[in-house]
Swiss-Prot record:
Function (record text): Binds directly to 23S rRNA. The L1 stalk is quite mobile in the ribosome, and is involved in E site tRNA release.
Family: Belongs to the universal ribosomal protein uL1 family.
Gene Ontology MF: a single term: rRNA binding
Organism listed in the record: Hamiltonella defensa subsp. Acyrthosiphon pisum (strain 5AT)
Residues annotated as transmembrane: none
Assembly notes: Part of the 50S ribosomal subunit.
Protein name as it appears in the record: Large ribosomal subunit protein uL1
Biological process (GO), any one: regulation of translation
One Gene Ontology term, aspect cellular component: cytosolic large ribosomal subunit
PANTHER family noted in UniProt: 54S RIBOSOMAL PROTEIN L1, MITOCHONDRIAL (PTHR36427), LARGE RIBOSOMAL SUBUNIT PROTEIN UL1M (PTHR36427:SF3)
Record flagged with keyword Repressor: yes
Gene: rplA
Length: 233
C-alpha cells in the first residue's frame, strides 16, 4: 500500500467522516485544512430526494451568488444590433454572430460562458457538437438564451452559478473561495439552497434535500448537520 502524503494524513486525523458538522465549524476546519499552493474553491454536494431516471424530476437552473465565486468570468455573446451594443456595455469579452462562430470552429475558445439572444440560435445551433460536450451550449433553462442580453452578461460576471443534478440526483457546484469570510460562504450557500428549493420538481416526494457536504478543491468532504441548516432548508 502506498504511503499517505503528509497532507492526507493530517486530513484523516482531523476529519471525522461519520460526524455531521455545524456550518461555522465546517468552514473553520476547511480553512485550516486548505494548505494547497493555490486558493482552493469551496465546493458543495447536495443530495436531492429525486429520481434522476425520470425527466420530470431532474433539477437544473442558475442563481447569482451574493458574493460571487471568486473567479473572473469571460463571456461570449451571440447577438446582433442593439443587443450587441448592450452586451459590450455590460462587459462581454466577445460579441458576434457568424464571425464568432468561425472563431469557435477554429478552436478559439477563450471564454467560460456563452450567452445568446433567441434570434442567434440559428447560428449557435450549428455549434452544438463543439459547445455541448464542454457544457457551454446556451440554454433558456439556465438563462443563457434570453432577449435580455445585458442582464445575462451582468449576472454571469457577478458570479452566477449553473447547476444540474447528476445521474445519482446530486448537485455539484462551487460557493466561493476558501479565503472568503465564513459569513460570505454561508450566504452563498443560502442562495444556492433557496434556488434549489424553488426548483423542486412537483413530482418529487419525501425529503427533498437529503444531505449537504462541503469540501475544498484538494480536501475531504464534511457532512453538514441538517439541524444547523434548518433556516436554509
Amino acid at each position: 500500500m502506498s504511503k499517505l502524503s503528509k497532507r492526507m494524513r493530517v486530513i484523516r486525523e482531523k476529519v471525522d467522516t461519520a460526524k455531521q458538522y455545524d456550518l461555522d465549524d465546517a468552514f473553520l476546519l476547511l480553512k485550516k485544512l486548505a494548505t494547497a499552493k493555490f486558493t482552493e474553491s469551496v465546493d458543495v454536494a447536495v443530495n436531492l430526494g429525486i429520481d434522476a431516471r425520470k425527466s420530470d424530476q431532474n433539477v437544473r437552473g442558475a442563481t447569482v451568488l451574493p458574493h460571487g465565486t471568486g473567479r473572473s468570468v469571460r463571456v461570449a455573446v451571440f447577438t446582433q444590433g442593439a443587443n450587441a451594443e448592450a452586451a459590450n456595455n455590460a462587459g462581454a469579452e466577445l460579441v458576434g454572430m457568424d464571425d464568432l462562430a468561425a472563431q469557435i470552429r477554429n478552436g478559439e475558445m477563450n471564454f467560460d460562458v456563452v450567452i445568446a439572444s433567441p434570434d442567434a440560435m440559428r447560428v449557435v445551433g450549428q455549434l452544438g457538437q463543439i459547445l455541448g460536450p464542454r457544457g457551454l451550449m446556451p440554454n433558456p433553462k439556465v438563462g443563457t438564451v434570453t432577449p435580455n442580453i445585458a442582464e445575462a452578461v451582468t449576472n454571469a460576471k457577478a458570479g452566477q452559478i449553473r447547476y444540474r443534478n447528476d445521474k445519482n440526483g446530486i448537485i455539484h457546484t462551487t460557493i466561493g473561495k476558501i479565503d472568503f469570510d465564513a459569513h460570505k460562504l454561508k450566504e452563498n450557500l443560502e442562495a444556492l439552497i433557496s434556488a434549489l428549493k424553488k426548483a423542486k420538481p412537483a413530482t418529487a416526494k419525501g425529503l427533498y434535500i437529503k444531505k449537504i457536504s462541503l469540501s475544498t478543491t484538494m480536501g475531504a468532504g464534511l457532512m453538514i448537520d441538517q439541524s444547523a441548516l434548518s433556516s436554509l432548508v
